[in-house]
Amino acid sequence: MNNIPYICGVTFAPFVPAGSFSQERARQSLRTMKENTNANFIILAPNGLQETPQSEEICYTSAATMTDDELKGMIEYAQSLGLRVALKPTANCKNGIWRAHINFFDEDVPCEPKWGNWFASYMEFQSHYARISQEMGCEMHITGCEMVMSEHREKEWRQTIAEIRKDFKGLVSYNTDKYQEHNVHWWDCVDVISSSGYYPIDDWENQLNRIEKVVNQFQKPFFFAEAGCMSTAGSKNVPNDWTIRGGIDLQGQADWYQTMFDACEKRSWVKGYALWSWTDRLYAASQVENHCDYEIFAKPAEVVVKNHYQKKAQA
């Protein structure tokens, strides 16, 4: 199994619109993130938008997506801070339906949207950013995120990754969703297996046992390209549910992070995390009680993350 340096990572300002990365507050937020977490790695996630899960065209040139120049500037700035960078161009749906539900008929039907047309647009989207990854010296290119209903289209995914490799010579990964690691049958064509680690606080050992079988089968490095828990009461039991509403539970979020780190430390094959997520518009630390989301800034979970990442940096 090829090894990779341990990833003490954070997903920074995913899906921000044009203009966001040109603001000084975004750079200040990135500096604060590095100082407060001891992170050595970030994922940047440009936003590609299609109208619905059954739309064939992905747009990444509108005002809803950071410009190429902004993205390059943020990559360069992050690297100047000593951060390793990965790009994860991500397809989303304008109507708010989660990208995992992007799906088409398996057999082409006249007058109906088709996988072939969608993958052609998706490949163009990914290749555009793969060229930026190569130009800017990014360490990794992550070819997609939580595209659950598409993952059985093995031929198209292999073709997409082969095309990306023509433009990008670094590490290539794909970020599958929680509970799906064993359902991807084409891990052999990526360099690094990654997934979204939103597992209940009391289920980490069970899920890691399952994932370990996949890692052993394919003999690839593994990390969690996303992982996080909201500081909302109940989130630690179902951390993937961003619709949970309730009172603030700062300690519950911190406990979830500590449980994840403790469980994964027993597994040498877990090579890190890119935690979800850190905003480009930080709230005032005094207002933390008003923020029950995945953010960890000025919350007890931030201390848990900093301690773990500091320990890994010294190892």
Labelled PLM ranges:
Residues 2-4, 21, 263, 267-315:
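Aromatic-rich peripheral "rim/lid" segments of glycoside hydrolase catalytic domains that contact
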Residues 6, 39-56, 70-150, 279-281:
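Substrate-binding cleft and catalytic face of glycoside hydrolase catalytic domains
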Residues 13-20, 55-68, 108-121, 144-151, ...:
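The substrate-binding groove and active-site-proximal loops of carbohydrate-active enzymes
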Residues 19-35, 119-132, 177-186, 254-263:
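Short, acidic/polar
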Residues 19-34, 59-80, 124:
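Aromatic- and glycine-enriched glycan-recognition loops and surfaces
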Residues 33, 42, 141, 193, ...:
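Conserved, mostly hydrophobic/aromatic
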Residues 66-68, 73, 80-84, 88, ...:
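Glycoside hydrolase catalytic-domain groove-lining segments
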Residues 124-125, 140, 147-175:
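Active-site neighborhood of glycoside hydrolase catalytic domains
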